[in-house]
């Protein structure tokens, strides 16, 4: 399965090892959040997120490598086709698909790039975002 988000711009990616609950599976490219002090897959209600650098199969240890901060750009997919008006706007993520939720503006964990190449008008793919509210 292709990664939901891919890093496209980072001079130096800072990462940390964070605790994860046994039995939790996280795929490479997933966004993650914190629940009860442990890393979980991010959902629409997540108020801060990080990027999962490596896949973490269920029952494969108690730590996971995630990004620290937000000094990098991600490429992801929107749940609708991109429009120029989406540049610079903050959005949520969708629960099940981890796409950029154009209709969601509650937690605003992602911010669409203001660059000319932030997305292709009429296409939902390859939209550039930054984590707007990093875990740490």
Sequence positions of predicted segments:
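Surface-exposed, low-hydrophobicity beta-strand/loop segments enriched in small/polar/acidic residues
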Residues: 1-136
């Amino acid at each position: 399965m292709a990664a939901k988000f891919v890093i496209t711009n980072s001079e130096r990616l800072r990462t940390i090892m964070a605790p994860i609950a046994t039995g939790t599976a996280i795929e490479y490219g997933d966004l993650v959040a914190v629940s009860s002090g442990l890393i979980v897959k991010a959902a629409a209600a997540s108020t801060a997120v990080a990027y999962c650098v490596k896949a973490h199969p269920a029952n494969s240890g108690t730590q996971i490598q995630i990004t620290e901060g937000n000094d990098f750009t991600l490429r992801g997919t929107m749940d609708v086709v991109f429009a120029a008006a989406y540049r610079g706007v903050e959005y949520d993520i969708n629960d099940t698909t981890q796409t950029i939720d154009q209709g969601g503006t509650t937690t605003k964990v992602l911010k669409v790039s203001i660059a000319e190449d932030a997305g292709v008008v009429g296409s939902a793919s390859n939209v550039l975002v930054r984590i707007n509210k990093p875990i740490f």
